[in-house]
């Protein structure tokens, strides 16, 4: 597959991942994520700090979508956008970002990419935390809201302040993950209805996205023998 991939031009629009970092030298990512677009606000390495490669997986999904179609084909895969990455979570031995500073960290990560390259981009924020008061604004969600409408902001203690008026020229599209469901139930519909989005997905000016699948057939791998899908499509 890697031999059939044609990366987008250097100045093409990008998906900027604010996540756990990306393993940039991955064979399917390296030509779409330049070293100059591989950042971190913690330490010096932009490589994935997650033990299971969360940021790398999210970057691959944003770049290719479902890989099955490409793997089963022999056609050239022409890409039309590039990747950027800012690592926002610590690796081994690095200091955790205080929860009160998640918003400030997001502002810093956003500025880092915009200073580095003036290209068009969509921000993909796939980090979240359990909310203390589900649905209510937080310092983090307020920072995302301000970034989305092109407003400068600052945290003063536990207060959030806007320091400029909205600027349409500086507006940004933020796609924010709805969060995770950490437990499983047979009645998945009730579980979906009763689960709340995680912070900062309650922000008003971002596009909050959750996950779904159309994979409704049992895998062919023998280890899944006897397994059945939980539900039908729709």
Question: What are these model-predicted stretches?
Answer:
Residues 3-37, 45-101, 118-122, 134-135, ...:
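Subtilisin-like serine protease catalytic core
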Residues 88-203, 215-216:
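Substrate-binding/access-modulating region of protease and related hydrolase catalytic domains
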Residues 54, 178, 233:
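Short glycine-rich loop/turn motifs that provide flexible caps or phosphate-binding loops at active sites
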Residues 35-48, 187-196:
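Short helix/strand-bridging catalytic loops that position acidic/His residues to coordinate divalent metals
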Residues 49-57, 157-163, 211-214:
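Low-complexity, flexible helical/coil segments
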């Amino acid at each position: 597959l890697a031999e059939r991939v044609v990366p987008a031009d250097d100045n093409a629009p990008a998906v900027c991942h604010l996540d756990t970092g990306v393993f940039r030298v991955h064979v399917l990512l390296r030509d779409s994520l330049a070293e100059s677009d591989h950042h971190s606000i913690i330490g010096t390495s932009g490589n994935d700090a997650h033990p299971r490669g969360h940021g790398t997986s999210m970057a691959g999904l944003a770049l290719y979508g479902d890989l099955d179609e490409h793997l089963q084909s022999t056609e050239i895969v022409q890409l039309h956008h590039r990747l950027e990455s800012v690592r926002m979570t610590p690796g081994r031995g690095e200091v955790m970002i205080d929860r009160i500073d998640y918003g400030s960290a997001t502002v810093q990560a956003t500025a880092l990419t915009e200073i580095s390259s003036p290209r068009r981009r969509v921000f993909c924020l796939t980090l979240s935390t359990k909310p203390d008061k589900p649905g209510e604004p937080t310092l983090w969600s307020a920072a995302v809201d301000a970034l989305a409408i092109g407003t400068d902001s600052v945290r003063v203690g536990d207060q959030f302040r806007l320091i400029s008026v909205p600027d349409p020229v500086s507006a940004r599209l933020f796609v924010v993950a709805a969060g995770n469901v950490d437990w499983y139930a047979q009645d998945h519909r009730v579980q979906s209805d009763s689960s709340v989005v995680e912070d900062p997905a309650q922000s008003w000016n971002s596009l909050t996205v959750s996950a779904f699948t159309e994979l409704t057939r049992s895998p062919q791998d023998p280890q899944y023998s006897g397994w059945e899908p939980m539900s039908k499509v729709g």
